[in-house]
């Protein structure tokens, strides 16, 4: 996983009783959350090793998301 990689949101990997129908990107500017639908593509802008998260651009939004709920798209076919 590195900046520039295309990733897909995987809500199923979140260990919750009622997984949300959207991944929430944390917007540090407004301290709010932006929706990112399960299965939609995004691109890693920067990795954040301290929090085990990534800054991702997805669905027209940019925010932080846990690396646990994203999966790199294998472009090799």
What are these regions (language model features)?
Residues 2-77:
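Basic/aromatic-rich interaction segments and small domains that mediate binding to polyanionic partners
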């Amino acid at each position: 996983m590195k900046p520039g990689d295309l990733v897909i949101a995987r809500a199923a990997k979140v260990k919750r009783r009622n997984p949300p129908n959207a991944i929430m990107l944390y917007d540090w500017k407004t301290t709010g959350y932006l929706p990112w639908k399960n299965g939609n593509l995004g691109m890693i802008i920067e990795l954040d090793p301290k929090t085990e998260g990534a800054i991702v651009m997805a669905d027209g939004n940019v925010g932080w998301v846990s690396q646990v709920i994203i999966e790199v798209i294998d472009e090799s076919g």
